[in-house]
Amino acid sequence: MGSMAAAAEAAQEEETVVFRSKLPDIEIPSHLTLQAYCFEKLPEVAARPCLIDGQTGAVYSYGEVEELSRRAAAGLRRLGVGKGDVVMSLLRNCPEFAFTFLGAARLGAATTTANPFYTPHEIHRQASAAGARVIVTEACAVEKVRGFAADRGIPVVAVDGDFDGCVGFGEAMLDASIEPLDADEEVHPDDVVALPYSSGTTGLPKGVMLTHRSLVTSVAQQVDGENPNLYFRREDVVLCLLPLFHIYSLNSVLLAGLRAGSAIVIMRKFDLGALVDLTRRHGVTVAPFVPPIVVEIAKSPRVTADDLASIRMVMSGAAPMGKDLQDAFMAKIPNAVLGQGYGMTEAGPVLAMCLAFAKEPFEVKSGSCGTVVRNAELKIVDPDTGATLGRNQSGEICIRGEQIMKGYLNDPESTKNTIDKGGWLHTGDIGYVDDDDEIFIVDRLKEIIKYKGFQVPPAELEALLITHPDIKDAAVVPMIDEIAGEVPVAFIVRIEGSAISENEIKQFVAKEVVFYKRLNKVFFADSIPKSPSGKILRKDLRAKLAAGIPTNDNTQLKS
């Protein structure tokens, strides 16, 4: 029986319709550690600008960044960090983010990245789950972690000031008395180097274990080869505006820029005037954006085509972009190629990328999110039967390759539910591949709400809501929003006799979560629709929204 089952499985694998990049596979040096890979061409670029701090104007050459990462590694080791440990980076974009990440990598440690504007509860939960040994943060988050860290004996390093109970970044990491790390620790390509948190297709945030091999492969899939899919040149100036605590920016901006030898201009936060100023001053040529930034540029009368004339490439990820928006935006950036990518944290994160970005570009279609990256396989499966589908048939997108995650930290069950026995990562996204190998996303199986590219897990908000004494049951689903893409809205069942209002519920949630997880609207219902197994029927609730629901505080839905 066992041999028959194996034969049947092998036959099914042979019948699988697999899609690959139009670009040929390349040799990827996945035996290298991430830092060795990024600095492999250091002798050629040592004197070139590497990181430019948009706020202070400080410029760090490639040679300086490499040395400072060694110094940061020595500083982290002095704070007790060793191979297999975890460093929490609780920072907005800044040079210290790069020094810390690369320094931890040299020690064989992993970095778990988090948004400094998270609430204390959100930060503490991630730091505890990840097992952080050191927290590197900035002024806006010091108060959120100081007590938590002191209780657990975790050193806190502050990059931008002197605070009681913290050590300064310069003193801890960059002091001249600290000898830079001479030799990196013995690191295996399958050791974890990045530990971002993602909700995957469902549930609460989970630690995504990305290894040195994962990230080397993912970056190489983008920028390596004679005809790279993402053609970064050494003379390029890449804008690093999207938050580095998000894996897309860490991978496709910082690490890809380092590998290519480009200059990287770091912005701490989005400000349209500052963006224009930095673009003019430094001659920015590559600008990775998300659609909300594209919307603001497209609609702002303050931005002219002259302001952004140096930009030759605009990478848009995290959410789909319609043709009307593209046209309005391109009028402001007439010299640029605009294209989209498609990613998922668990996939390393890039699954697909626009081939108009290649050194030898291809014609691409509007609305496509690109073609699967090279050295990887993609298939479309029927979400109900698991059967493989062909071209122009919509189903769940699955990806396989060395770039995908090792698994979820301490969560084998969720790992098993996401990566099947054949090594295919199931994205929870519904899409199809057309006759030209271009991928189109049409729907989402997974529950995650995408607010301006940020993940909002419904389960997290639901768990919070039902802790309120006036709330009997709750469900959270996305509602379409022109600016944000999606916003979270809640369906609430009040306990008998309660008169709790929409505003009271919104305020209750706002105190506990980061700004982008706050509820946009609250609707009251007699009950939450659920399957026999108790699973919330989110499609039913989304259908109610699509049908149009009155939005006053007294809305009562009959289920």
Swiss-Prot record:
GO terms for molecular function: (E)-caffeate-CoA ligase activity; 4-coumarate-CoA ligase activity; ATP binding; CoA-ligase activity; trans-cinnamate-CoA ligase activity; trans-feruloyl-CoA synthase activity. The keyword Transport does not apply. Keywords: ATP-binding, Cytoplasm, Ligase, Magnesium, Nucleotide-binding, Phenylpropanoid metabolism. It catalyses: (E)-4-coumarate + ATP + CoA = (E)-4-coumaroyl-CoA + AMP + diphosphate; (E)-ferulate + ATP + CoA = (E)-feruloyl-CoA + AMP + diphosphate; (E)-caffeate + ATP + CoA = (E)-caffeoyl-CoA + AMP + diphosphate; (E)-cinnamate + ATP + CoA = (E)-cinnamoyl-CoA + AMP + diphosphate. (E)-4-coumaroyl-AMP binds at residues 248, 252, 318, 340-341, 345, 353, 446, 450. It is found in: Cytoplasm. Expressed in roots, stems, leaf blades and leaf sheaths. Its EC number is 6.2.1.12, 6.2.1.34. SUPFAM superfamilies: Acetyl-CoA synthetase-like. Pathway: Phytoalexin biosynthesis; 3,4',5-trihydroxystilbene biosynthesis; 3,4',5-trihydroxystilbene from trans-4-coumarate: step 1/2. CDD domains: 4CL. CoA binds at residues 269, 452-453. Residues 271-340 are annotated as: SBD1. Residues 341-408 are annotated as: SBD2. It comes from the Eukaryota. Its cofactor is Mg(2+). Belongs to the ATP-dependent AMP-binding enzyme family. Both substrate-binding domains (SBD1 and SBD2) are involved in the substrate recognition, and are sufficient to confer the substrate specificity. This is 4-coumarate--CoA ligase 4. It comes from Oryza sativa subsp. japonica. The lineage of its organism: Eukaryota, Viridiplantae, Streptophyta, Embryophyta, Tracheophyta.
